[in-house]
């Protein structure tokens, strides 16, 4: 059925289209933290996230990364390939920050000699726990070969993103990716890429991401607008 709500999320709603293999993603004017425990309506945030994510996905597509992104169709909407989402959050860390610093008792801002890839099990009831490769296999999420692919593709995407953000004066601290299986059973990059799931610091160490909301550091949309303008100029 066309225009039927398929999924209602914290930051995005997903609808069916005339093509059973294509979905319409609507970005919402809402910020959340602590797995949705804190919610706040923020006017204009959805449009900013959509435009930023669209720009980044377009660049990734051109760079040869296979993604779900098709096109942006309005300020807060885009068309995507329909995928079966893998219930993993794949996090890559270039610099210590956030939960990593808290978990291991290290200060924020320490550059990691080798970027670290982490897995988190996407399960709201369990608060998305940190898991390792063996847990991933035990849960039957993906196999060894697919784990290796997810890690390798995440590291490749990291090198691309780091380079692009460096060109506009931003340091990519860490980011979260989600992948899914397309209609042919191929793993492709899905979800979004925006300051909601990319931790970005400027040259002075100022937060240019969702931490502005998490830590009450200022106006979130003002910060996201700066990131968007920088990406447009790239």
Swiss-Prot record:
One of its GO terms (biological process) is 'de novo' IMP biosynthetic process. It comes from the Bacteria. Its EC number is 6.3.2.6. Pathway: Purine metabolism; IMP biosynthesis via de novo pathway; 5-amino-1-(5-phospho-D-ribosyl)imidazole-4-carboxamide from 5-amino-1-(5-phospho-D-ribosyl)imidazole-4-carboxylate: step 1/2. It holds the Pfam family SAICAR_synt. Keywords: ATP-binding, Ligase, Nucleotide-binding, Purine biosynthesis. GO terms for molecular function: ATP binding; phosphoribosylaminoimidazolesuccinocarboxamide synthase activity. InterPro entries: SAICAR_synt/ADE2_N, SAICAR_synt_PurC, SAICAR_synth, SAICAR_synthetase, SAICAR_synthetase_CS. It catalyses: 5-amino-1-(5-phospho-D-ribosyl)imidazole-4-carboxylate + L-aspartate + ATP = (2S)-2-[5-amino-1-(5-phospho-beta-D-ribosyl)imidazole-4-carboxamido]succinate + ADP + phosphate + 2 H(+). Transmembrane segments: none annotated. Belongs to the SAICAR synthetase family. This is Phosphoribosylaminoimidazole-succinocarboxamide synthase. It comes from Streptococcus pyogenes serotype M6 (strain ATCC BAA-946 / MGAS10394). The lineage of its organism: Bacteria, Bacillati, Bacillota, Bacilli, Lactobacillales.
């Amino acid at each position: 059925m066309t225009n039927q709500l398929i999924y209602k999320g914290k930051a995005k709603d997903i609808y069916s289209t005339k093509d059973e293999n294509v979905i319409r993603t609507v970005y919402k004017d809402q910020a959340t933290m602590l797995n949705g425990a804190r919610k706040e309506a923020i006017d204009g945030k959805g449009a900013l996230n959509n435009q930023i994510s669209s720009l980044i996905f377009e660049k990734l597509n051109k760079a040869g990364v296979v993604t779900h992104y098709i096109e942006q169709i309005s300020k807060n909407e885009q068309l995507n390939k329909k995928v079966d989402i893998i219930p993993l959050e794949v996090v890559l860390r270039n610099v210590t920050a956030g939960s990593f610093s808290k978990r291991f008792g290290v200060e924020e801002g320490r550059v990691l000699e080798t970027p670290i890839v982490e897995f988190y099990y996407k399960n709201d009831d369990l608060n998305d726990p940190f898991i390792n490769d063996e847990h991933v296999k035990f849960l039957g999420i993906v196999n060894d070969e697919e784990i290796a692919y997810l890690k390798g593709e995440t590291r490749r995407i990291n090198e691309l993103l780091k380079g692009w953000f460096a060109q506009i004066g931003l340091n990519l601290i860490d980011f979260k990716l989600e992948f899914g299986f397309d209609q042919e059973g191929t793993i492709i990059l899905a979800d979004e890429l925006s300051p909601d799931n990319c931790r970005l610091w400027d040259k002075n160490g100022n937060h240019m991401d969702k931490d502005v909301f998490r830590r009450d550091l200022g106006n979130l949309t003002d910060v996201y607008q700066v990131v968007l303008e920088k990406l447009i100029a790239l």
